[in-house]
């Protein structure tokens, strides 16, 4: 059954959220989802996701934080 994993990086300083996200991507099984909550848009992460074939959807939330949902194909 697909699993959703959460990294709430809103209280972390860069590059910690990016490092945690990259480590977690290596653990995702096909169909799993990684949910990131961040105060800034992770532009370097987007390039990595596109290069490696991950699907993602990013939303700017009402509180100004960014919600990024990443799926392993």
Segments (PLM) and residue ranges:
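An N-terminal amphipathic alpha-helical segment
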Residues: 1-27
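Short aromatic/hydrophobic contact patches that present stacked aromatics
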Residues: 6, 35, 67
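Residues that cap or initiate secondary-structure elements
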Residues: 13, 42-44, 62-64
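Short, structured protein-protein interaction patches enriched in aromatics and acidic/basic residues
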Residues: 35-55
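C-terminal edge-of-domain segments
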Residues: 53-73
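Sterically constrained small-residue positions within well-ordered secondary structures
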Residues: 27, 47, 59-61
